[in-house]
Amino acid sequence: MGCIEHKSQPAESAKTDEHSFNSKGEMQPRAPETPSKEFKNGKVVKVNDVTPKGVYRPDYKILTPNMRSPEYVQMSTAAAITLGVTNGKMYRCDCTRCLNLLLTYPEGCRANCAYCGLARHREAERDYADRNFIRVDWPSVPTEKIIDIVAKDGDQTPFHRMCISMITHPRSDADTLTVLKMWTDKISPETVPVSILSNPTTKTTGDVRQLKELGADIFTVALDAATPELFDRTRGKGVQSPHSWKKYWQILESARDIYGKNKFGAHIIVGMGETEFEVLNLVQQLVDMGGHSHMFCFFPEKGSLMDHLPATPKSQWRRVQLARYLIDYCDVRVEHMKFDSEGRVVDYGMGASELSNIIDDGTAFRTSGCPGKVRDDISACDRPYGDSPVSDISSYPFKLNKKDIKKARKQLNIPVVQNT
């Protein structure tokens, strides 16, 4: 989708203010505490050993059942509503187009990422199946039940994509393969394409290849942090977590070689202390590799080591959203752009009129992720309100209306271009 003429956007129409970004100095996670032995590795759930009965909705007033993959998986609240296994409504959304599945075990995720509600340090506070993740609860559902519902719907399924999300657990690699095979045995990848959100820490190149052979369409890696330093601070040794930047990139490069152009990507969280220049250089690097970036706006997750920190300012988020869209889909390069002394975008490397048209289209401000069945630049993984409240939406899970676009333009501080 080449769509632009590379002319400079006048700097005065992309003004920034001095407090419009989250700086590295302020975005410091708390130090993790070590849970006492009686709470480690899901001990409470395993000792009680409550037999699961169908769908389990997080409930802190009852004993959490002993559920584990591949027999059980968790799913986002939006997916559970769309599938019909739980009741609820979503603001301005009839459904979600991506069936997000999350592997689950009483031991939980053994990583300790600072921004994540599933992190290991929460063992004493909350059983794994009851923890919030990207702002919502994740009901646990028998895997066969999910597959049977989607298979029965056939071509009429509301889902344009399914994604298996791994966690850091000794069984996660093998169980991802099992869940994928259970799915593709009954549902054609042509009906519902499959993505893998991987855990590179335990992955090998052989694992990456085997997932493709079993029917996975897109392979993604959650880098999340935009620089090696921030990665180590939030996902590695800085928070007593096992992940490494080097291993994540090794698996990402394997995915490039095995899946091919436009069939791999990386998640990036904006606003954890990186500059806009740094994150957009990463976006450019991914595009040059043949992949895509899937952007998230930092929002302090309750119970995480960063829940005391500010959400990404909307001005910073909108600038990065817009610039990322231009790099990913409009043939603009980061070298065409200009940045101020704080690394903020002040020139998008595009003529004012063309840029204004892209803003007015609104697609740049929608949730980014793996594509569905509409357009390559419209994500099936719409994650309703996963990074903001409905009162001030960061990633729009639906087509923006004129009022939404007006608000996004105001947050960008880019005026409407008057046609002469």
Regions found by a protein language model. Name each.
Residues 188-198, 259-268:
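Short beta-strand/loop segments at the ligand-binding rim of alpha/beta enzyme cores
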Residues 103, 166, 198, 268-270:
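Short glycine-centered, acidic/aromatic-flanked micro-motifs in structured strand/loop junctions
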Residues 147-150, 177-184, 208-209, 249-253, ...:
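Generic structural signal for well-ordered alpha-helices
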Residues 218, 223, 227, 245-305, ...:
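Conserved C-terminal portion of the radical SAM core fold
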Residues 1-97, 280-420:
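Auxiliary Fe-S-binding modules of radical SAM enzymes
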Residues 121-145, 149-175, 190-207, 211-249, ...:
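Core AdoMet radical
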Residues 72-122, 161-164:
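N-terminal pre-triad scaffold of radical SAM enzymes
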Residues 160-186, 271-278:
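Conserved glycine-rich "GG(E/T)P / GGGxP" loop and the immediately following alpha-helix
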